Swiss-Prot record:
GO MF entry, a single one: potassium channel regulator activity
Higher taxonomy: Eukaryota, Metazoa, Chordata, Craniata, Vertebrata
InterPro entries to which the protein is assigned, alphabetical: BTB/POZ_dom (IPR000210), Ion_trans_dom (IPR005821), K_chnl_volt-dep_Kv (IPR003968), K_chnl_volt-dep_Kv5/Kv9 (IPR003971), SKP1/BTB/POZ_sf (IPR011333), T1-type_BTB (IPR003131), VG_K_chnl (IPR028325), Volt_channel_dom_sf (IPR027359)
The name this protein goes by in its record: Delayed-rectifier potassium channel regulatory subunit KCNS1
Protein species of origin: Rattus norvegicus (Rat)
Function in brief: Potassium channel regulatory subunit that modulate the delayed rectifier voltage-gated potassium channel activity of KCNB1 and KCNB2 by altering their kinetics, expression levels, and shifting the half-inactivation potential to more polarized values. While it does not form functional channels on its own, it can form functional heterotetrameric channels with KCNB1 and KCNB2. Each regulatory subunit has unique regulatory properties that can lead to extensive inhibition, significant changes in kinetics, and/or substantial shifts in the voltage dependencies of the inactivation process.
Gene it is expressed from: Kcns1
Length: 497
């Protein structure tokens, strides 16, 4: 009988070399013959079979049960079944259930190279590996999957799970989904339509207010009215437009405060770009009120000081144009555009660099070739002409007259077409990707009528501290659970390979 724990001076191997290898891979138990493993000594299981000591064997597996003489591997069980087929036939086939990245990791772990792939699967694997998409924030232009990322779904799940321990969690969650997801229910669609209408009405009122017939007074008249003790708003604004502005501000303030109260996390609320846009859309109004109060408190100030405060008020009023960005909350295209610009900063930087180089070169040529009295007096003045020409805008305010200047203008225009077209194609492909991805994510999480989303909500409702703790313990003791699936009195079915 071979001793499992030989003494330091013993020369008896720790296990017979012809003994079958008992392995457990992710709960799948198999008994592998030594002869089958000896055919592939370079693989992990082949080296494990040839290990001369228990210490060497333990370095090749995740755990070892000396009593059962069983080796445990915390790896993908599906790939292990394909690995068994490899030991039988000598060919490895690609698994469709694993992505190229995960399949390659498993193959590297078990000590298999590309030569182990079967001929029928090798070309497909190599093609998928070459075109395997990488993260958009890397130097990659290959389009990735349009399916929602598991991390994005997990973020939604974590946000919803925060309502489990909150007071009135179910009601707050439904109200939050109603405000955040236009397709969640009929009330959410109505709320979205009303919000879009208020945004458009606010923008229309701001544009109409700039027309001459709606401006009863100029800025100087407003300052004079404040000095006389009257309100500048009463002088400058049309009563109808002023009431419409107050209504829009009340609605925007209601939206911001409601989202803040219903948000699952206050910290995440202030980190979300759309919420910051909502705050910026109402902030100018309240800053204008503060500036108006400051004007009212300084009636004895000089006209120059009042004029400066009046300019500050005008700047605050112009900031209302940022309200148009509120439409991004209700527009998949605008959100996709924002994500595209966020992940295309390299391409945008390259585009600006190309334009800067081209403008500098052709501006210098035009400055040298043209006369000084036709708009090319200085190189900075030529920069304007070069920028307009390279972007193919062509205002026509500055036109070269000499032959050399016209040749430089032709080269500037052709160079602009080539320079702008190259990065634009990459940016457009990324926009198409993020648009499809955003649509897929919305379809996965916003409709409560779908079975997946209902299961998600019900799982969030049913989560308790006990179930969470039980789930945590189950995940931590997954390996022991797999080992206990078969009673000791009932030996596992062994297969020799």
């Amino acid at each position: 009988m071979v001793s499992e724990f030989p003494g330091p001076g013993s020369r008896v191997p720790w296990r017979p070399r012809d003994e079958a290898l008992r392995v457990n891979v992710g709960g799948v138990r198999r008994l592998l013959s030594a002869r089958a493993l000896a055919r592939f000594p370079g693989t992990r299981l082949g080296r494990l079979q040839a290990a001369v000591s228990e210490e060497q064997a333990r370095r090749l597996c995740d755990d070892y049960d000396a009593a059962a003489r069983e080796f445990y591997f915390d790896r993908h069980p599906g790939f292990f079944l394909g690995l068994l087929h490899f030991y039988r036939t000598g060919h490895l086939h690609v698994l469709d259930e694993l992505c190229v990245f995960a399949f390659g990791q498993e193959a590297d772990y078990w000590g298999l190279g590309e030569n182990a792939l079967a001929t029928c699967c090798r070309a497909r694997y190599l093609e998928r590996r070459v075109t395997r998409p990488r993260a958009w924030d890397e130097d990659s232009d290959a389009p990735s999957s349009v399916d929602p990322c598991p991390d994005e779904i997990s973020d939604v799940q974590r946000e919803l799970a925060r309502y489990g321990a909150a007071r009135c969690g179910r009601l707050r969650r439904r109200l939050w989904l109603t405000m955040e997801n236009p397709g969640y229910s009929l009330p959410s669609k109505l709320f979205s339509c009303v919000s879009i209408g208020v945004v458009l009405a606010s923008i229309a009122a701001m544009c109409i207010h700039s027309l001459p017939e709606y401006q009863a007074r100029e800025a100087a008249a407003a300052v004079a009215a404040v000095a006389a003790g009257r309100s500048a708003e009463d002088v400058r604004d049309d009563p109808v437009l002023r009431r419409l502005e107050y209504f829009c501000i009340a609605w925007f303030s209601f939206e911001v405060s409601s989202r803040l109260l219903l948000a699952p996390s206050t910290r995440n609320f202030f980190c979300h770009p759309l919420n910051l846009i909502d705050i910026v859309s109402v902030l100018p109004f309240y800053l204008t009120l503060l500036a108006g109060a400051a004007l009212g408190d300084r009636r004895g100030a000089s006209g120059e000081e009042l004029g400066d405060l009046g300019k500050v008020v005008q700047v605050f009023r112009l900031m209302r144009i940022f309200r148009v960005l509120k439409l991004a909350r209700h527009s998949t295209g605008l959100r996709s555009l924002g994500a595209t610009l966020k992940h295309s900063y390299r391409e945008v930087g390259i585009l600006l660099l190309y334009l800067a180089v081209g403008v500098s070169v052709f501006s210098g040529v035009a400055y040298t070739a043209e006369e000084k009295n036709v708009g090319f007096d200085t190189i900075p003045a030529c920069w304007w002409w070069g920028t307009v020409s390279m972007t193919t805008v062509g205002y026509g305010d500055v036109v070269p007259e000499t032959v050399a200047g016209k040749l430089a203008a032709s080269g500037c225009i052709l160079g602009g077409i080539l320079v702008v077209a190259l990065p634009i194609t990459i940016i457009f492909n990324k926009f198409s990707h993020f648009y499809r991805r955003q649509k897929a994510l919305e379809a996965a999480v916003r409709s409560s009528g779908q079975r997946e989303f209902e299961d998600l909500l019900s799982s969030v409702d049913g989560v308790s501290d006990v179930s969470l703790e039980t789930s945590r313990e189950t995940s931590q003791e997954g390996r022991s659970t797999d080992l206990e699936t078969q009673a000791p009195s009932e030996p596992a079915k062994s297969h020799s390979y």
